[in-house]
Curated annotation (Swiss-Prot):
Classification via PROSITE patterns: PDXT_SNO_1, PDXT_SNO_2
Taxonomy, superkingdom: Archaea
Physiological role: Catalyzes the hydrolysis of glutamine to glutamate and ammonia as part of the biosynthesis of pyridoxal 5'-phosphate. The resulting ammonia molecule is channeled to the active site of PdxS.
Annotated source species: Pyrobaculum neutrophilum (strain DSM 2338 / JCM 9278 / NBRC 100436 / V24Sta)
The protein's name: Pyridoxal 5'-phosphate synthase subunit PdxT
Pfam families associated with the record: SNO
Lineage summary: Archaea, Thermoproteota, Thermoprotei, Thermoproteales, Thermoproteaceae
Gene field: pdxT
């Protein structure tokens, strides 16, 4: 089985290592590849979209022809994890905590609303312990993190947190074969990557 990591920008290597370690823990044979072109999507059984800068990821995906290819593959059932900026890229509604509505290129596939930079900039980074059904307990690392504020359709918000200004917000969202996290699981745990490998068809 092949797992793919979108390799346009962000912490690509950390996701590659997290998939490799998760596969080892599950006793599975998994090759992890970088996804840089539309044709790279053809053979993978699961995908991670890393954090980074969401407007840059969207612009590069459009320029390389990956925007439509990613949308088609994920709509077709490819299990996909979006972390931090990757979660923003998956969402249908995106606004910034400072500038409001954004016009950035997004996949627009998950029925969730996301606020970019909800926890401030780099200096407001933090870690918390979270527990989520199906994934278990994990240490979550938030870096310039977004927040999920609303879900509709078949999407489900998870991992609740109290935000000083936004009130009750959520650090994760699930919708069928798609998972979005406001935090960076690749930096502290293999639990989310194990979950994704278990979603994938062998």
């Amino acid at each position: 089985m092949k797992a793919g990591v979108l390799a346009l920008q962000g912490d690509v290597e950390e996701h590659i290592q997290a998939f490799r370690k998760a596969a080892q823990e599950l006793g599975r044979s998994v090759e992890v590849v970088q996804v840089k072109r539309p044709q790279d999507l053809r053979e993978i059984a699961v995908l991670a979209i890393p954090g980074g800068e969401s407007t840059t990821i969207g612009a590069l995906a459009r320029r390389t022809g990956l925007l439509d290819a990613l949308r088609d593959a994920i709509k077709g059932g490819l299990p996909t994890l979006g972390t931090c900026a990757g979660a923003i890229f998956l969402a249908k509604e995106v606004r910034d905590s400072v500038v409001g509505e954004t016009k950035q290129p997004i996949l627009g596939l998950m029925d969730i609303a996301v606020v970019r930079n909800a926890f401030g900039r780099q200096r407001e980074s933090f870690e918390v312990d979270l527990r989520e059904e199906g994934i278990g307990a994990l240490k979550a690392v938030f870096i310039r993190a977004p927040a999920f504020t609303k879900a509709w359709g078949s999407a489900r918000l998870a991992a609740p947190l109290k935000h000083p200004e936004l009130g009750q917000i959520y650090a994760a969202a699930f919708q069928g074969h798609m998972v979005a996290t406001a935090f960076h699981p690749e930096l502290s745990t293999t639990a989310v990557h194990r979950y994704m490998l278990n979603l994938a068809k062998t």
